[in-house]
Amino acid sequence: MITGKDMYDVLAAMVPLYVAMILAYGSVRWWGIFTPDQCSGINRFVAVFAVPLLSFHFISSNDPYAMNYHFLAADSLQKVVILAALFLWQAFSRRGSLEWMITLFSLSTLPNTLVMGIPLLRAMYGDFSGNLMVQIVVLQSIIWYTLMLFLFEFRGAKLLISEQFPETAGSITSFRVDSDVISLNGREPLQTDAEIGDDGKLHVVVRRSSAASSMISSFNKSHGGGLNSSMITPRASNLTGVEIYSVQSSREPTPRASSFNQTDFYAMFNASKAPSPRHGYTNSYGGAGAGPGGDVYSLQSSKGVTPRTSNFDEEVMKTAKKAGRGGRSMSGELYNNNSVPSYPPPNPMFTGSTSGASGVKKKESGGGGSGGGVGVGGQNKEMNMFVWSSSASPVSEANAKNAMTRGSSTDVSTDPKVSIPPHDNLATKAMQNLIENMSPGRKGHVEMDQDGNNGGKSPYMGKKGSDVEDGGPGPRKQQMPPASVMTRLILIMVWRKLIRNPNTYSSLFGLAWSLVSFKWNIKMPTIMSGSISILSDAGLGMAMFSLGLFMALQPKIIACGKSVAGFAMAVRFLTGPAVIAATSIAIGIRGDLLHIAIVQAALPQGIVPFVFAKEYNVHPDILSTAVIFGMLVALPVTVLYYVLLGL
């Protein structure tokens, strides 16, 4: 039976943690003591020093030879059961997705055991329960957080491959990742080089691209006063995990306002009307002053020909034609000898290029159905810029249908002066649709195929791996490299993440020291233990203080909507405890050990899963709400479980 003293002990353990959190919240929101930059510094200190040393302190002081394997088996079985159920749901349900699988696994199985669990369970059930929580922390740090990283990197690799190698992924036999590439989370610009071997297989090299960011910087400086800055600002999209640089405009009027400056656009593309004799659809960027290497291929038909020749590489267009199949397209950016790139601005997220092997060269064009771009010209002609467009959004999908409908009924120019060689059709169609989509109300110029028929497809609007015509075949299943190749790539990226994470070292060193010290009864030198304890003692309070700063910096406590927040709280405080109760009973756990397992599963959401979700952009709003709102309701919920289980 729970007495008043028991309740007081629980509150005495938990209230100080909430005091630290409230003080941090007030320091930002009410009193303005800390700026966001200062908060970032505090959070960095907590992540690099306070929490790792706190983890080391708890793990190194726990006896690994007295671990309760039944309790650990029940906890591990809970996670395996939930993960298996989510995997089956993701594999066989139409509504299943890898992103939701990861998020639901985090919500249901990964509580804040280190910061909240140890003091709370010790106050409720005694010191032995605190030792059980330390054992859970060891498994979380070494196994379950590593599994989370594996899932996130698998998602990042899948996105990268599907966008840059949508039809040839099955031919990839190896990946080599440069040492300065830390993650495939999509936050840093990456460049892929694909070498074609004698066996016809692809050998891909992934490296960080400095050219993409430098070109974006050059474009910003050159057009800072002319083009609206929002045109190159990332905006939200339903392509989860991708920051999308695109123009906020569409062909049809939409509820959102357009930030596109049409005057600047036409001024840029109408600077010259004289085409190349070979290609009839060209413009010089910036007019006569653009100098050599300034050809931009657009849909502005010429009024006559000029004696000058184009510096355009026909091999690029031949490659573009091949790469355009299956609904992919090129948006036609050309890079001119380190000068300003043509409009629209390239996306620095991913770039791709290929280098030859055994005298064989082939370019892999990415930007799978959402839209992409090929950049060539001068010394940069080996680089392909992959633009991750938001054409998968509902507005853009509607525009794709409208564009196709109009394409079949639009008057077609048949002037022989502006006819296009067959190998140029895909590129010019792509540029046409780009211009039409960015210029509401403008009547487009629709190209004809060799038979004089409109193809009925918009390469720019094409969906990945499918024909976008009404009545066309459904999407084909995305090819992926062999499992061994994917596994090796993901293990490389996970390893690079782990060796840069201080918590990895603190957990492994703490476990190693505990194995040695409890085996041979060796005590840590006083100087070393004192150096660790002076920071680890502050770790618990600083972790809660950092959480309060995080809460204060968020615009809303409930960032994902009330219905989604309610669903997340149900998964966190009901599903997790229910499943671990079932797995514990199945293993044969009863009494206080069963109660500890259930209360531990009802702790608030862990912070580390939120950090991963934020970094990889997989439902960070849901995890943010689970952390913040979960901390507010965790005390009454866990006390309620404690009281009900003690009846």
Curated annotation (Swiss-Prot):
Signal sequence segment: none
Record key words, sorted: Auxin signaling pathway, Cell membrane, Membrane, Phosphoprotein, Transmembrane, Transmembrane helix, Transport
Membrane topology note: Multi-pass membrane protein
Residue list for modification Phosphothreonine: T354
Induction (record text): Down-regulated by endoplasmic reticulum stress treatment.
Segments crossing the lipid bilayer: 8-28, 39-59, 69-89, 101-121, 132-152, 508-528, 532-552, 569-589, 593-613, 627-647
Modification Phosphoserine occurs at: S237, S258, S310, S393
Location of region: Disordered: 339-380, 397-420, 440-481
Keyword GTP-binding: no
Tissue-specificity statement: Root-specific. Localized to the cortex, epidermis and lateral root cap, predominantly at the upper side of cells.
GO cellular component term of the entry, any: plasma membrane
Binding of (indol-3-yl)acetate, residues: V51, N112, L114, Y145, I607, V608
Topological domain spans for side Cytoplasmic: 29-38, 90-100, 153-507, 553-568, 614-626
Described purpose of this protein according to its UniProt entry: Acts as a component of the auxin efflux carrier. Seems to be involved in the root-specific auxin transport, and mediates the root gravitropism. Its particular localization suggests a role in the translocation of auxin towards the elongation zone. Recrutes NPY proteins (e.g. NPY1/MAB4 and NPY5/MEL1) to the plasma membrane in a polar basal localization in root epidermis; this activity is optimized by AGC kinases-mediated (e.g. D6PK and PID) phosphorylation that limits their lateral diffusion-based escape.
Subunit structure: Homodimer. Interacts with FYPP1 and FYPP3. Component of a complex made of PINs (e.g. PIN1 and PIN2), MAB4/MELs (e.g. NPY1/MAB4 and NPY5/MEL1) and AGC kinases (e.g. D6PK and PID) at the plasma membrane. Binds directly to NPY1/MAB4, NPY5/MEL1 and PID.
Protein name per its UniProtKB record: Auxin efflux carrier component 2
Gene coding for it: PIN2
